């Protein structure tokens, strides 16, 4: 099953610093050994509870659960992971992630986020990870489009609501500022997430208009992988999903 995913999203496309693939793998894995699959953005205690409830022994996430070759260091930095990891071992549940190898696909994360907000448009590739919607649009119009499907916080460095742009550039997740700057123009509105103060300064100094939305929009990954798996395994393997509701709220 994971070989099927790697045919579409090759591990070779994973960044050198990334930890795509298995964070924990049970020694056996044939198709007949699968009791169920849960697809989520991240592995948390809630996702593990969902897997136990569904009697699933494979969890597929976008973000890798383990980001370190040294488990002791990983658990020291993120203590909550040790308890989850020990449960995975005890219950024989494998965890597999598709991260930058999924992002790098022509229809990767940025493509699907762009498609979510502009369903009638065809996103064009922008660098390795970005997607561009070519359209004339004002900042106020973009806000209205985002609000139709997104209720989280929206931040921008441009107060000119009526200023006209010729495209919307999506860099899903924590977009890399030098890459964003390289592949965009002053006439693009840039949409990304988790923008650091230094990135706001960098892009503002380069006269770029930035719009910051929640990283949680990457949950579109779940929909894509769920569709792929249920199309392939129409019978025999139960595929479930886990979405966070209101993980981050305004005070």
Curated annotation (Swiss-Prot):
- Listed binding positions for a divalent metal cation 2 are 63, 215, 219
A Pfam cross-reference name: DUF34_NIF3
Top-rank taxon: Bacteria
SUPFAM superfamilies cross-referenced by the UniProt entry: NIF3 (NGG1p interacting factor 3)-like
Q: Name one GO molecular function term.
A: metal ion binding
Q: Provide the Gene Ontology terms for cellular component.
A: cytoplasm
Q: Where is the signal peptide?
A: none
Which key words are in the record?
A: Metal-binding
List ligand-binding residues for a divalent metal cation 1.
62, 103, 219
Q: Family membership, please give it.
A: Belongs to the GTP cyclohydrolase I type 2/NIF3 family.
The UniProt subunit note reads as follows:
Homohexamer.
Q: Which PANTHER family match?
A: GTP CYCLOHYDROLASE 1 TYPE 2 HOMOLOG (PTHR13799:SF14), NGG1 INTERACTING FACTOR 3 (PTHR13799)
Q: What is this protein called?
A: GTP cyclohydrolase 1 type 2 homolog
């Amino acid at each position: 099953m994971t070989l099927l995913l790697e045919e579409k999203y090759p591990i070779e496309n994973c960044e050198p610093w990334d930890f795509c693939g298995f964070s924990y793998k049970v020694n056996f894995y044939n198709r007949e050994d699968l009791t169920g699959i849960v697809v989520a953005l991240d592995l948390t205690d809630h996702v593990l509870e969902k897997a136990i409830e569904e009697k699933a022994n494979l969890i597929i996430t976008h973000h890798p659960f383990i980001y370190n070759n040294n488990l002791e260091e990983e658990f020291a930095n993120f203590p909550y992971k040790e308890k989850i990891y020990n449960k995975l071992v005890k219950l024989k549940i494998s965890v597999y992630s598709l991260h930058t190898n999924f992002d790098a696909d022509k229809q990767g994360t940025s493509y699907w986020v762009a498609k979510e907000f502009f369903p009638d448009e065809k996103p064009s590739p922008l660098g390795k990870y970005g997607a561009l919607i070519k359209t004339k649009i004002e900042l106020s119009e973009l806000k209205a489009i985002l609000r139709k499907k997104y209720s989280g916080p929206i931040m921008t460095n441009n107060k000119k609501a009526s200023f006209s742009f010729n495209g919307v550039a999506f860099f899903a997740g924590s977009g890399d500022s030098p890459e964003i700057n390289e592949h965009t123009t002053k006439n693009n509105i840039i949409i990304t997430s988790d923008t650091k103060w230094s990135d706001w300064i960098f892009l503002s100094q380069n006269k770029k208009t930035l719009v910051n939305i929640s990283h949680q929009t990457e949950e579109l990954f779940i929909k894509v992988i769920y569709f792929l798996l249920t199309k392939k395994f129409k019978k025999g393997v139960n595929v479930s999903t886990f979405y966070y509701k209101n993980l981050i709220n305004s005070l």
